[in-house]
A protein has these predicted regions:
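Glycine-rich, acidic/polar active-site loops that bind/position phosphate-bearing ligands
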Residues: 2-356
């Protein structure tokens, strides 16, 4: 449940009002994975969580610290508190920022601190006061997964009842062909109810969901779209989103994965992000240039394309990323910007005449 807390005192009150038994602190490692630990409410201390901080071993978190300088601190953001829809025991989750001990300097490799710093810089320039982001994350839901990497061997196998490669097996004949998964109804779309359960929990946690549907690929490719939000809030929402997706899938004995290209000869999963700058409540990217853009929007796109090689280290960080970035599978393989063309690195969608 969303709590709409703004102060530590609001969080303390929410613990009592909702008979919370545990407080769960969540933070993001360098690879984007959520980490956490939980406190019984008997040991909850408002000052510890929101001012002094709680310590942890940074050398055991990927990409953070070496063993000789391992101690780090977590200080929670009260505005992020929500009642965790995944936990069985009544649990309030709150997202934390990572700090250096003693000096309380923000930790430079904490992804949440990075985006907070970027937002603060944007505001300091006076160019814009808000950046809205609207990611469209895609993922697969597999029925079974097995993999092994041995010293002299390696293997993996994916199982999906709806997959095109199962047409030769006895059972229901409702299979989705390669590239045939975009928008079919049940019984071809076997994941309607699981997606709806995911959306229900996301909404309960405070996320704003616009739509959900089966995606293009066979074997349970899925998309759930969030309503756009300011950049830091959206970063938090996406962590909650992935947390709920993976846990709901696991509850049903399935595995959800956001890896870019798990299947050969079918579309991979991406997460393109709608972006817009606003100032004083007005959109700065609407104008009279190509595709209804303003000059600022064109310059903004130019900056992305100029630095696209460096951005790939963040946007396409694994070797599997490049298995997706090939022609013929609706992946952005051209360093260009274009209206409607899904092969362009920057696409201007044509869906409405509204400047918003």
């Amino acid at each position: 449940m969303a709590l709409n807390c703004s102060t530590p005192a609001d969080v303390t009150k929410a613990l009592s009002d909702n008979n919370i038994q545990f407080v769960d602190l969540k933070f993001t490692d360098l690879y984007g994975q959520w980490q956490h630990f939980s406190l019984p409410t008997d040991y909850y201390d408002e000052e510890d969580l929101f001012k002094s901080g709680l310590g942890f071993d940074g050398s055991s978190i990927r990409g953070f610290k070496s063993i000789e300088s391992s101690d780090m601190m977590l200080v929670c953001d009260p505005t992020t508190a929500f009642i965790d829809p995944v936990c069985q025991a009544p649990t309030l989750s709150v997202i934390a920022n990572v700090y250096e001990p003693g000096t309380y300097e923000v930790f430079s490799r904490d992804p949440r601190n990075v985006i907070r710093k970027a937002e603060a810089y944007m505001k300091s320039t006076g160019i814009a006061d808000t950046m809205f982001c609207g990611p469209e994350a895609e993922f697969f839901i597999f029925d079974k997964v097995r993999y092994e990497t041995g010293r002299y061997s390696g293997q993996y196998e994916l199982a999906s009842d709806e997959a095109a490669w199962n047409t030769g097996n006895w059972g229901p004949g409702h299979k989705i062909g390669y590239k045939g998964g975009y928008f079919p109804v049940a019984p071809f779309d076997a994941f309607q109810d699981i997606r709806s359960e995911m959306v229900t929990l996301m909404t309960a946690a405070g996320l704003k969901v616009e739509r959900h549907h089966h995606e293009v690929a066979t074997a349970g490719q899925t998309e759930i779209d969030l309503r756009f939000a300011p950049m830091v809030q959206m970063a938090d929402w996406m962590q909650i989103y992935k947390y709920i997706v993976k846990n709901v899938a696991a509850k049903h004995g399935k595995t959800a994965t956001f890896m870019p290209k798990p299947l050969f000869e079918d579309n991979g999963s991406g997460m393109h992000v709608h972006q817009s700058l606003w100032k004083d409540g007005k959109p700065l990217f609407a104008g009279e240039e190509y595709a209804g853009l303003s000059k600022m929007a064109v310059w903004y796109i130019g900056g992305i394309l100029t630095h696209i090689n460096s951005l790939l280290a963040i946007c396409a960080p694994t070797t599997n990323s490049y298995r997706r970035l090939v022609p013929g599978y609706e992946a952005p393989v051209v360093i260009a910007y274009s209206a409607r063309n899904r092969s362009a690195a920057c696409r201007i969608p044509v869906s409405s005449q509204s400047p918003k």
